[in-house]
């Protein structure tokens, strides 16, 4: 419903041209009613929603306003409505085990199960959610009043060495694929795996993965990739890369962030950085000593066990212990201002054509003042205060992602 106004605005912009960016403090009255009204007219997407991890939890109801304690439920339908979030990329995340055939098979089954859970969400709530597989789907679904569900893969480890599985996941709706996660794998070097030997960026199998994704029309997500892997991906890929949840290292030097020089290369290649809101990646936050001790004990208890070898009871026990630690010894939070510093710095370096939002909701993201997706209008308010235009906001909140998706679709056709 809200997007009917957006469609009319798009026609007017096409006839008259987009507005020029106002100077700071000019152009828009950012009184609460006005910035919220504008925000809810925009097509608002996030490129990294870890919410599918909650779908197997019997206590989770996507239609309910679930308790929003940080680290638990940050995305559900009421919060999306309040925050003007139209949807985005719902993540198929699979933890990594040993690099062997048995573990690959177990990981593949886990990833397929998660993919099916996303489809089941849509089947159970067809009036609220719809699967999107093309760039044009986003506007249509949002205009219908439903939430947009694109699928993405975080960590291609479950593919094993069978690249035919990329097409299998494509046929199941996946349109964004990340080769690697916290550890080096069969495809690429990870930004955070400091113990393993250097694979040289992409392995030969990793290069094949990128080419196959290009052939199918999938976008490439280089978040979690080492710098060498990111540069190799840009060299091999025929389409620009997406950094679905990443920060800038010039403000906080963390392996998950990238330098200004590398960010400029991503932008020159047509890519986009979607700014992460995971506090420990954007600010030096010291965890409580009790938390470190408890997490170490939990790690030692499950040391050497592949996550796919755990029984359902063991998995539930592990997750319950993790949740107990999170609630008893929570990590200190970063702040909304620190998050916005990250976004504004990226905008200053590469401009609004190459920056977006990928806060890592339900996967560790969220800061004080922006604890869940209901707080997203605050980002629009701040960007307006900084002088960014409605046209800029349209790009930042989803337009840049859809541009790259259209490029991927065109590359497939060619």
Predicted regions and their residues:
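Sec-dependent signal peptide recognition
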Residues: 2-10
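Intrinsically disordered, low-complexity segments enriched in polar/charged small residues
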Residues: 7-8, 53, 250
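Short, linear, compositionally biased motifs with a strong N-terminal bias
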Residues: 10-11, 173
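C-terminal motif of bacterial Sec signal peptides marking the signal peptidase cleavage site
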Residues: 13-15
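N-terminal hydrophobic targeting/anchoring segments and the immediately downstream early-domain regions
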Residues: 17-199, 253-414
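Divalent metal-binding pocket/active-site signature
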Residues: 158-160, 171-256
